[in-house]
Amino acid sequence: EKVEGINYHKYGAHIFHTNIKEVWDYLNKYCTFNRFTNSPVANYKGELYSLPFNMYTFNKIWGVITPEEAMAKIDEQRKEIIGEPRNLEEQAISLVGRDIYEKLIKGYTEKQWGRDCKDLPSFIIKRLPVRLTFDNNYFNALYQGIPIGGYTKMVENILDGIEVRLGVDYLKHRDEFDKIADKIIYTGPIDAYFNYSLGTLEYRSVRFENEVLDIPNYQGNAAVNYTDNETPWTRIIEHKWFEFGKDEEGKDLRKTIISKEY
């Protein structure tokens, strides 16, 4: 949705990325992607850290200079956990150590899940990316960017000439749709799809508080995560930076839009 000349991600920030050339080539038939690279920042009690965890992060936390020094600090702190991790907290510490866990994982995760990390299962975190380089690119994907003009325009181009039915509940018309399509992609609640045969799942939702600000720059980055427990929101998105603060004519945008996520 365009507001004040800014393509505002109404349903949350999304950065397209893929390693599959076939997918990239297909979408480029319907849009042109800009060169946006996702490089989020973490704010822990007023201190800023680079994400994903990389040499900038380790230098800020420990003052280390070399990858060898960084890995030595991580290995030293990982030893705190003996045996199989029993919960998410122990799993995270066993992967990256307590300092990174306390500053950059604990508060953010507990706000996302609404649970203490000690009460969350360890399998939620299979691995945590640790980069012993000064690479701030969040994704490892070969192809990455934001569709110029927005995702809505891209989807409209894809759907041109295709029948679209809105406001239809697949589960109420399952037999009908199963007959007219070889493949169906279902994006509704998975427990409803199986008719709650294993019970009802718990769901977490995301709430956005959006503000239009009469300033040119609020935080200087598209995404800033707030990783302490005291700050109620998980992150702030400043939408204009997905397109480098420019309008479609390449002119600087005078205002900005931020979204606080809860």
Q: Where are these predicted regions, by residue range?
A:
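A short acidic, glycine-rich active-site loop
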Residues: 10-14, 144-145, 210-211
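Mid-domain catalytic core of redox enzymes
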Residues: 170-262
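Short, well-ordered beta-strand micro-motif
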Residues: 17, 43, 259-261
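Conserved beta-strand termini and adjacent loop/short-helix elements that scaffold enzyme active sites
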Residues: 36-38, 167-169, 239
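Conserved beta-strand segments of alpha/beta enzyme cores
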Residues: 7, 32, 163-165
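Glycine-rich FAD cofactor-binding loop and adjacent beta-loop-alpha segment at the N-terminus
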Residues: 1-30, 40
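Active-site/ligand-binding neighborhood in enzyme catalytic cores
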Residues: 42-50, 55-183, 187-194
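Short acidic-hydrophobic surface loop/beta-edge motif
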Residues: 2, 40-44, 224-226
